[in-house]
Amino acid sequence: MKAVCNAFFGFRAMGRLGRDKHFYDYVDDREDSGKNIKAIADYGLTHVPSYDNPFINYICLNSYPAHALPFYLRRENVELIKSRLDRIEVRHCDLLGLEGKFDFFNLSDIFEYMSGDAFLQNTAKLCELSNPGARALYYNMQNKRYFADSRLTLQKELSETLTNNNRAFFYRDCLVYVFGEQDEQSDP
């Protein structure tokens, strides 16, 4: 099993058969990427409940059974979601070209796909765009990218809880930073 995971989830195979090969241009530890993904998946598949996990069910069954619907598809959440749609402003764009001030950023795993210099530029721009107390959430999958800017404070306990209970089990870290708060700063 180890050899299969190392072969299939290694950057060479993933670049040919899965994700765009350029997604691996900036992976920190390319030679061990298969081993790293296997370790993350092993944890997720053995420590995170799978029966009602929408990600595992969709990956395995190509559908969501009724017992494993994501929150946004559950009937009991429809009215709540509808009532809060005005709170969300979706911007699909390059962070560096964005203008304005924001309270929350869901950055997914964008930092996987850029150079270290681009990461620093995007970090500076994020700080420029952040209102005091703004939060930024992002994932590390194969890279280990952490904000070093003193204006951004890692919410370590929350980040560890989210990482350890992340139902999208294939990420190394789920990180939450707050702009302008210095009470819980720590290095991962």
Where on the chain are the PLM-derived regions?
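A short acidic, Gly/Pro-enriched loop at the edge of an enzyme's catalytic core
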Residues: 93-106
